[in-house]
A protein has these predicted regions:
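Metal-dependent catalytic cores of enzymes that make or break cyclic nucleotides
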Residues: 125-131
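Short alpha-helical scaffolding segments that buttress acidic/His motifs in well-ordered protein cores
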Residues: 62-70, 110-116, 157-165, 180-184
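Short, surface-exposed helix-loop/turn micro-motifs enriched in polar/charged residues
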Residues: 80, 102-111, 129, 149-153
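Histidine- and acidic-residue-rich, metal-dependent catalytic cores
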Residues: 85, 92, 109-110, 133-171, ...
Length: 239
């Protein structure tokens, strides 16, 4: 049976989800690949197709514009770059399938938030102020989508962006969409083993000019995660 692929030699998200966790190695290969610049519009639309969303109407132009914005890396980040965005999109959409996200509107919002949650990330230049980057990324996103969404959706998205501030455990996380995004943001460093987690920690070490070894940075990440924990059963079972 022909599979709908992300790119040559990669099976569809549906195939990966239907064969999970035996198919984890397929997702890992695509998530870790950083030789080729991602085509975000293609990845996002194919993920939406796999979530049974084939018509995005008013969101098509928005997604094209956001895909272009997210393709830039003006601050030369080695962790919060296009490949981090790519991994969060794919893992978020996988979790949406595994945890049975039902609303079509939520599926579209999921892809938009996963793509842009670290939009224009400042990397080592980020101001040491809680929620600074999260609010900046949301502000940059809001310039694009403000006229297309309701106030209710606007504040819902804003809450999710603020919740991605990793050092603080967000309160009252009851939103299925929010749970998916929060788990997807960190799962790439957890679900593929310690060696992969260390590889991402090394990228982050270089980005923020961390003075100590990458394994110390990774252990600090795991310690913080202990106090936060993953939200979805499908996320926990994937590790």
């Amino acid at each position: 049976m022909r599979q709908y692929i992300f790119e040559k030699h990669y099976p569809s998200l549906s195939y990966i989800a239907n064969n999970w966790p035996r198919s984890k190695h397929l997702l890992k290969k695509f998530v870790l690949s950083n030789q080729k610049k991602p085509d975000f519009y293609e990845i996002c639309t194919k993920c939406l197709n796999d979530l049974n969303i084939f018509k995005i109407r008013d969101y098509s132009s928005i997604l094209k514009k956001l895909s272009k914005l997210c393709s830039y890396n003006f601050t030369y980040n080695s962790y919060h770059d296009q490949h981090h965005f790519k991994s969060v999109i794919l893992i978020a959409c996988l979790l949406a399938k595994l945890s049975k996200l039902k609303s079509n509107d939520d599926k579209i919002l999921l892809v938009i938030i996963a793509l842009t949650h670290d939009l224009n990330h400042q990397g080592r230049r980020v101001i040491n102020k809680p929620y600074y980057q999260e609010e900046k990324s949301f502000k940059d996103l809001s310039y694009v989508i403000f006229k297309k969404i309701t106030y209710k959706k606007y504040y819902r998205i804003k809450k999710i962006f603020r919740s991605t501030f990793f050092p603080v455990k967000p309160s009252h996380v009851n939103d299925h969409l929010e749970k998916i995004i929060l788990d997807a943001d960190v799962l790439a460093s957890l679900m593929f083993g310690i060696k992969t987690g260390m590889k991402f920690a090394s990228r982050l070490k270089h980005e923020i000019r961390f003075d100590d070894k990458a394994d110390i940075l990774f252990r600090g990440f795991l310690k913080l995660l202990d106090s936060k924990s993953l939200y979805l059963d499908s996320s926990k079972k994937s590790c």
